[in-house]
């Protein structure tokens, strides 16, 4: 992620060989995955069960990994509606600078055992520890999604999005570029 801030010097630690889904219980909405696993592989496995990563990790390359997505903390266009990547981290297994294999959090939605250290590593770019496994909360895919496109300038787009945000609309993402506002609606067919 050199494009994001100052490029770092040093050796790259490649974890792409440390891949695979460790545990996935669709009924519990939890997936534990090794961090070298590609985002595409995780999304495919979830889609087969009608589920998704709600934070929609951006894909900067076809072989982007879950470890990269969580380590960078990047979230996609659904962030405003669903939450950020760190909001979906239930637990992590990491290697610290001393080489210790540590686990924080767990595989349950409610974790009230003090500080949520598993979320600290989300967005830390590997500066706190090397993430080796992550347990993620996943969500059911919406029944239907559609994107509306409006021609409007910056000020009108900001005003429209702010107005719509205060209404009970199933908006899951917005994007404005080159005089066009894209509004994605997600949910039940009747609502969309």
Feature roles, as predicted:
Residues 3-7, 23-24, 43-44, 192:
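Short loop/helix-cap segments at secondary-structure boundaries that form the rim of catalytic
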Residues 3-8, 75, 106-107, 133:
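Short acidic, glycine/serine/threonine-rich loops at helix termini
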Residues 10-14:
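A glycine-rich beta-to-alpha transition motif near the start of alpha/beta enzyme domains, typified by
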Residues 67:
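ATP-binding N-lobe of GHMP and related small-molecule kinases
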């Amino acid at each position: 992620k050199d494009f994001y801030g100052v490029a770092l010097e040093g050796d790259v630690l490649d974890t792409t060989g440390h891949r695979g889904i460790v545990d996935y219980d669709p009924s519990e909405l939890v997936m534990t995955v090794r961090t070298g696993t590609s985002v595409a592989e995780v999304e495919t496995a979830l889609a087969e069960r009608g589920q998704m990563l709600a934070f929609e990790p951006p894909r900067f390359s076809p072989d982007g990994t879950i470890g990269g997505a969580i380590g960078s903390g990047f979230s996609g266009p659904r962030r405003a509606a669903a939450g950020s990547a760190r909001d979906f981290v239930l637990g992590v297994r990491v290697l610290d600078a001393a080489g210790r294999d540590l686990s924080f959090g767990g595989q349950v939605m409610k974790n009230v055992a003090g500080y949520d250290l598993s979320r600290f590593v989300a967005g830390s770019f590997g500066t706190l520890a090397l993430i080796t496994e992550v347990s993620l909360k996943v969500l059911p895919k919406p029944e239907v999604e559609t994107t509306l496109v409006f021609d409007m300038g910056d000020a009108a787009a900001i005003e429209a999005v702010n107005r719509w945000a205060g209404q009970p609309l199933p908006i899951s993402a917005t994007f404005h570029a080159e005089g066009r506002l894209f509004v994605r609606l997600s949910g039940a067919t009747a609502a969309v």
